[in-house]
Each structure stands twice: as C-alpha cells, then as structure tokens.
C-alpha cells in the first residue's frame, strides 16, 4: 500500500506542477510543488508549495487557493483513480529556513575573517 501511496503522491505532484505552469502564471514569481502527502484512504492530500521570492509567498498562496477548485476539477478529469484526493495547499517554508541558515553562517564566517 505504501508504494501505491508513493505513486499517487508523485502523480499528483506532477499533474499539479503542470497545471500551475498552465493556469497560474505570475511575472517574477516561481512556484514549485515540493511534495505531496496523500492519506491512505486517498480521500485527501496535502500539497506543499514553495514560492520565490518568499516575500510574496502569503499573497501568492492566497491567490492560488482561490483557483484551487478549478485545478481540483481539472485533476478530477486527468488522474485515473477511483477516488481523486481533495487537495489542500500549504506553504513549504523549508527553503526559506535553509536560506536563513546560510545567511547566518555567512555572517559568522565574515565576522571571523574580520577578526
């Protein structure tokens, strides 16, 4: 069952990424589906997206959630499963977290070089 869930996760991730590219084009904003976690009963799935630049993430996520019903409807027609999971969107903040860690490490490195 786990392998099936993994395949469903990957399928939803690919289809969602494709639909984002087709229906959600914003200038100077990059949206990436980083992972999908589908429940074992296939009734719901959490999709995590990263948005760059991060400063526009909340606003962009809000806009994306507004068109999610349309994207869900399209997914219902393109994915061949008995049940198409209902997608919930979440902001994946891990890339921003990593970026902050790198900035802090760079500051420490710079301060050590100055002393």
PLM segments and residue spans:
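Charge-rich, low-complexity N-terminal segments
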Residues: 1-44, 50-115
């Amino acid at each position: 069952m786990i392998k099936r869930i993994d395949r469903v996760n990957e399928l939803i991730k690919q289809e969602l990424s494709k639909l984002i590219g087709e229906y959600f084009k914003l200038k100077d904003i990059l949206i990436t589906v980083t992972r999908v976690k589908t429940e074992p009963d296939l009734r719901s799935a959490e999709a995590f997206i990263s948005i760059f630049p991060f400063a526009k993430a909340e606003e962009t996520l809000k806009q994306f959630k507004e068109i999610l019903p349309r994207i869900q409807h399209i997914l219902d027609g393109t994915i061949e499963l008995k049940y198409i999971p209902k997608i919930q969107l979440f902001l994946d903040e891990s890339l921003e977290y990593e970026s902050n860690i790198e900035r802090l490490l760079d500051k420490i490195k710079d301060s050590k070089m100055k002393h």
